[in-house]
Structures are given as structure tokens and as C-alpha cells.
């Protein structure tokens, strides 16, 4: 239908007759001459419909409105002096139209294309219109480049691409499964995979050495700005490798992906233990674009005359007292603002938030009366305080303190505007605990139960570490993986520590345990969140921006109105009956 894309044309094409197709981006009538900015997937070009050149084309142009689909035939010419548009790639040329066809009109638009002030639910309802915006068009072109770069990079390193089943069985991987009822086997269900974890391990047992796929995964979990019920990951597994091999491979691939997206990143990435990350930054995915760090001061507070502080400080294993220094904070935040910060941390379980201000004559603040001068001097020394600095303190249970002080660190950085939005700061977090304790006292695997432990014979479960690795970018977990358990006895021992008895092991994981007894090789891998990667590359505020047809935060699709009710006939075929939700008394 067309001879060129809009932005294929340049001054070198002046005088050529061309045929273009696209949408009417804008329409203007200047003194009887109609100007139309024609838009296609490549960009914009200006069409000129002058009755002096073609009355027929001009008559058609008079009927054109926003988003009409057009086919235009005409000659390329240079724009007149002073009429060029440096903002457009084709800003030095235009097309004098000799023939114009309206291929399809458009109803009046529910919103202007590219207007991001429109409610997101409305934009998602008309996602096919929203996707016409230049910003989203560029995002999905970038996403395609990233996928191609990932495939090319892994292909160069000898990986084989596979497709693993989407209809599988439920396995405990940390979130709720999406279940699919079987018509053939009434009362039985498939589960949509939370990841291809077990299948990729089985492929290593099959001798394929290097596996990858760009996999669709499903998790029925509460949604946030960076989560969706269905998502895509670059899934990778390798045989006969150690952790260092996986890290080197992942850095090579990420370097290739980011280069394809216009970013040169430096390797190797910085590395940090889980303990250092949580104790220093209050997070296992710290944002290192700014240098606010937490400092341990529990031993100093143990000597405090304040009984609350001193009692907290006595149990150094279960409790924490952390200082967070803000350079020049006394000149940035008013006393009223600093008092208001307490409201922020209380939302995350804090009992309070103390602070000192570093003045010319030493530390000042309501907490000073509880300390000897020598202890105040030690706080100044340990926190390396200078005049004008403020240091905040959080005290209480370890898990709660590290969490709210980590959140407070991010909050302060945002308030001070010290986050460099153009900086890409990668980090490997290593030496994760193998297990984490739940609120009911039971234990679950921090990553998943197929991760190889470093020291399985430690008597205290909380002291067992895993050979796991997360790659972090700007405070987001970009991906994670581990060396896997390849020996049946170790896998069974991990299951037992998690409270999974032999009968349940056989029922849920019998196929894996069997595979491990037939010469399973040492293996490991990683999965990179492809949606999240694209969110960060494109500086998008939500993962929904980088998914063509995303769900809302309520896990609904305004476009297709999914989820929807099944018909009675469908339910009968599946042997299902919907029970009314019981009302609470």
C-alpha cells in the first residue's frame, strides 16, 4: 500500500513521488490550505493539501479529523524558509498531496492520544488508543530490542531456547497459584507456573547444559507498582557451574541488553552480603545511587539512662538500634519537619524516632539528657558528624527497625532530591539466609526449597546460608537465582527442615527426587524480571507502562473486562459449582 515509512524520507527525496499510510495526528486549515501531520510507526511527516495542486485531495482533507486512517500520494518538497521544524526528523520537508484516501474514519476520541493526565483506568479501557502515543510506542520498540539482545547474547554463549509447560501442577514457591480445572479429570486442577523452576532443572538432568527461555509466569499475589499477576522473565539454567560462572554470564547478558537500549554499563557489578545490605541500608535490594547509611550504635545506647533504650540494647541478637546520618540535615529540615518524620516511620511499626542535631557546641536534642558526655562524643565520632548534620535513631525489634529505617532512608533521599535519575547502579546481593521464620514460628525457604545450602549442618536454621544471588538495580530486585540442590539426600533434608514429610515430598516432588537419583549434574541459574528491566530502562513509573495489555492493581483488565463469570454450562462441564460468599456475623 505504501512506498515509504514517514521518517524514511529526507531532503535527498525531494522531487520523488511517494505513497504514505498512517493516522491523522493533527489537522490544521490555514487560509484554505489543509496541513495534516501524518503519523505511522516511524514518526511524523507533514502533508500539504492545497486546492491549487489537487482540488480532489483538498476536498477529502476537509473531512479529515483526528486519528482518521489515511493513504496519501504526492511529491516530497522542501519546506519554505522559516517554516522548518527542528523537533521533527522530517522537519525540513513536506509532501504535496495529489491523492488522498480515507481508509477508515474514527469516532471522536475519549481522550487525546498521549495525554497522561487521563485516569489510568480510562486509558487501559482504550489501551489500543493509549498505545498509539509516542512514549508507549518507543517503550515497546525498546522492549523488542531488549528481547532480541538477550536472545543474541545467550545464543553466543551457547544456550538453547526451550518452551516449558504452562499447564503444570502446583508447587510451593511462595505465592498463590492460579488454578485451571480439568474437564477430563473432574475435581483435579492444573496450576499455571509461578516459574519454570523444576522444568529447567529437569532439562539439566537431561544433559542440555545451557537452557533459556523468555517465559511467561503467573502469581496470584497482592499487586504493587512493580508487580503483575502475569509477568515475563528471562529464565536461565546452566550445568557444571559455580556461582561465579552464573554471575559472569548474567553480567555479560545484561551488558549486551543495556547496550542495545542505549546504555553502556560497567562490569563487574559491586557485591554485598545480605547481612551488609540489610544492616547498612535496611533492605536486601538497596538503592546505591545515594550514600545514606545506617550505623550500629546499640552498644552506646546500652549505657543510656533511658530504660527503654538500655533494655532494647541488652538483646543484641533480636534487637537493633540504628543511626541514620543526614549530612547538613539541620539546614535542610526544620524542627517541625523532623518531628513529622516520626509519623512516617510509625506507619511501618516504629514506636518513635529520635534525633540529634550537631551544633557548633556539640550534640543537641531531647535525647542528650540520657547520655554521658563521653557517650555523646562517641556518637559524634562513630557517625562522623559535622556541624549542621542531623542523625536519626530507630530502636526495637531487628526486623521492624531494619525495615522502617530502610524505608525512611528512601523517604529522606526523595525529600532531599538527591537521587540521580540518570544513574544505573547495579549490585549483587549474596549469602542469603536459607530459611526465614514466619509469624507463626514456622520456617520457609527465603528463595525456594531447591537452593543449595552452604552449611546445612548448622544447628540453628537461621544460621544456614544459601548459595543464592540477587541482582539489584536502583533499589529494585532485577533478578535472582542460585546454585541448585543436585543430590537427593540434601534435597530431602531441606524438605524435612521445612516440615514437608516424605509422603508430601513424593506426592509433590517425586519426579524431581527421582531425577536427582539418575546422575543429576551440579547446576544453577538465574531469572531476570524482563518487565521490571524494561520499566527501569524506560524510567517508567509503573510496570503497567511496559506491558502491552496489563492488569490494574485490582488484577482486572478494563479493556476485555477480565476476569469474567463462567456460564452455567461451562461450570457443569467442569463439575464446578459457585458457592455464595458466607457473610460474617
From Swiss-Prot:
Its EC number is 6.1.1.23. GO terms for cellular component: cytoplasm. It catalyses: tRNA(Asx) + L-aspartate + ATP = L-aspartyl-tRNA(Asx) + AMP + diphosphate. PROSITE patterns: AA_TRNA_LIGASE_II. Pfam families: GAD (PF02938), tRNA-synt_2 (PF00152), tRNA_anti-codon (PF01336). Keywords: Aminoacyl-tRNA synthetase, ATP-binding, Cytoplasm, Ligase, Nucleotide-binding, Protein biosynthesis. The keyword Cytoplasm applies. ATP binds at residues 219-221, 228, 477, 529-532. It comes from the Bacteria. Residues 197-200 are annotated as: Aspartate. InterPro entries: Aa-tRNA-synt_II (IPR004364), aa-tRNA-synth_II (IPR006195), aa-tRNA-synth_II/BPL/LPL (IPR045864), Asp-tRNA-ligase_1 (IPR004524), Asp-tRNA-ligase_1_N (IPR047089), Asp/Asn-tRNA-synth_IIb (IPR002312), AspRS_core (IPR047090), GAD-like_sf (IPR004115). GO terms for biological process: aspartyl-tRNA aminoacylation. One of its GO terms (molecular function) is nucleic acid binding. It is found in: Cytoplasm. The record marks 30, 82 as: Important for tRNA non-discrimination. The keyword Protein biosynthesis applies. Aspartyl-tRNA synthetase with relaxed tRNA specificity since it is able to aspartylate not only its cognate tRNA(Asp) but also tRNA(Asn). Reaction proceeds in two steps: L-aspartate is first activated by ATP to form Asp-AMP and then transferred to the acceptor end of tRNA(Asp/Asn). Homodimer. This is Aspartate--tRNA(Asp/Asn) ligase. It comes from Campylobacter concisus (strain 13826). The lineage of its organism: Bacteria, Pseudomonadati, Campylobacterota, Epsilonproteobacteria, Campylobacterales.
Amino acid at each position: 500500500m505504501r512506498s515509504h515509512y514517514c521518517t524514511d524520507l529526507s531532503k535527498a527525496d525531494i522531487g520523488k513521488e511517494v505513497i504514505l499510510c498512517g493516522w491523522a495526528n493533527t489537522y490544521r486549515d490555514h487560509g484554505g490550505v489543509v496541513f495534516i501531520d501524518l503519523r505511522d510507526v516511524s514518526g511524523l511527516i507533514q502533508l500539504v493539501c492545497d486546492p491549487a495542486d489537487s482540488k480532489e485531495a483538498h476536498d477529502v482533507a476537509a473531512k479529515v479529523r483526528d486519528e482518521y486512517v489515511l493513504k496519501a500520494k504526492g511529491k516530497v518538497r522542501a519546506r519554505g524558509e522559516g517554516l522548518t521544524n527542528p523537533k521533527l526528523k522530517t522537519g525540513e520537508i513536506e509532501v504535496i498531496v495529489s491523492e488522498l484516501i480515507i481508509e477508515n474514519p474514527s469516532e471522536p476520541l475519549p481522550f487525546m492520544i498521549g495525554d497522561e493526565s487521563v485516569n489510568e483506568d480510562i486509558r487501559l479501557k482504550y489501551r489500543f488508543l493509549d498505545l498509539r502515543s509516542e512514549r508507549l510506542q518507543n517503550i515497546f520498540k525498546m522492549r523488542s530490542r531488549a528481547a532480541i539482545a538477550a536472545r543474541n547474547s545467550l545464543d553466543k554463549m551457547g544456550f538453547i531456547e526451550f518452551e516449558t509447560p504452562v499447564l503444570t501442577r502446583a508447587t510451593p514457591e511462595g505465592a498463590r497459584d492460579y488454578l485451571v480445572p480439568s474437564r477430563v479429570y473432574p475435581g483435579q486442577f492444573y496450576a499455571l507456573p509461578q516459574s519454570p523452576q523444576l522444568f529447567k532443572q529437569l532439562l539439566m538432568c537431561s544433559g542440555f547444559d545451557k537452557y533459556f527461555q523468555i517465559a511467561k509466569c503467573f502469581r496470584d499475589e497482592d499487586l504493587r507498582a512493580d508487580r503483575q499477576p502475569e509477568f515475563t522473565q528471562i529464565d536461565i539454567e546452566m550445568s557444571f557451574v559455580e556461582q561465579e560462572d552464573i554471575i559472569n554470564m548474567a553480567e555479560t547478558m545484561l551488558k549486551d541488553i543495556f547496550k542495545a537500549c542505549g546504555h553502556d554499563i560497567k562490569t563487574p557489578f559491586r557485591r554485598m552480603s545480605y547481612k551488609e545490605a540489610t544492616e547498612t541500608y535496611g533492605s536486601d535490594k538497596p538503592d546505591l545511587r545515594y550514600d545514606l547509611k545506617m550505623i550500629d550504635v546499640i552498644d552506646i545506647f546500652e549505657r543510656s539512662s533511658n530504660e527503654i533504650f538500655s533494655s532494647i540494647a541488652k538483646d543484641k541478637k533480636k534487637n537493633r538500634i540504628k543511626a541514620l546520618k543526614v549530612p547538613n540535615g539541620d539546614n535542610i529540615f526544620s524542627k517541625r519537619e523532623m518531628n513529622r518524620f516520626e509519623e512516617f516511620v510509625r506507619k511501618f511499626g516504629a514506636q518513635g524516632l529520635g534525633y540529634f542535631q550537631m551544633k557548633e557546641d556539640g550534640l543537641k536534642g531531647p535525647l542528650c539528657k540520657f547520655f554521658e558526655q563521653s557517650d555523646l562524643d562517641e556518637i559524634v565520632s562513630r557517625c562522623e558528624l559535622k556541624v549542621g548534620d542531623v542523625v536519626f535513631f530507630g530502636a526495637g525489634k531487628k526486623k521492624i527497625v531494619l525495615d522502617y529505617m530502610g524505608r525512611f532512608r528512601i523517604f529522606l533521599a526523595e525529600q532531599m532530591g538527591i537521587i540521580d535519575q540518570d544513574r544505573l547502579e547495579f549490585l549483587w546481593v549474596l549469602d542469603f539466609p536459607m530459611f526465614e521464620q514466619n509469624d507463626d514460628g514456622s520456617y520457609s525457604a527465603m528463595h525456594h526449597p531447591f537452593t543449595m545450602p552452604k552449611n546445612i549442618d548448622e544447628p540453628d536454621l537461621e544460621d544456614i546460608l544459601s548459595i543464592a544471588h540477587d541482582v539489584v538495580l536502583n533499589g529494585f530486585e532485577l533478578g535472582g537465582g542460585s546454585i541448585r540442590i543436585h543430590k537427593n539426600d540434601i534435597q530431602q533434608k531441606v524438605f524435612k527442615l521445612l516440615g514437608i514429610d516424605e509422603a508430601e515430598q513424593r506426592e509433590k516432588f517425586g519426579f524431581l527426587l527421582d531425577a536427582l537419583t539418575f546422575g543429576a549434574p551440579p547446576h544453577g541459574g538465574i531469572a531476570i524480571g524482563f518487565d521490571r528491566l524494561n520499566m527501569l530502562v524506560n524510567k517508567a513509573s509503573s510496570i503497567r507502562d511496559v506491558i502491552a495489555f496489563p492488569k490494574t492493581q485490582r488484577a482486572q483488565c478494563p479493556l476485555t473486562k477480565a476476569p469474567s463469570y463462567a456460564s452455567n454450562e461451562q461450570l457443569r462441564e467442569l463439575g464446578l459449582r459457585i458457592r455464595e460468599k458466607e457473610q460474617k456475623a
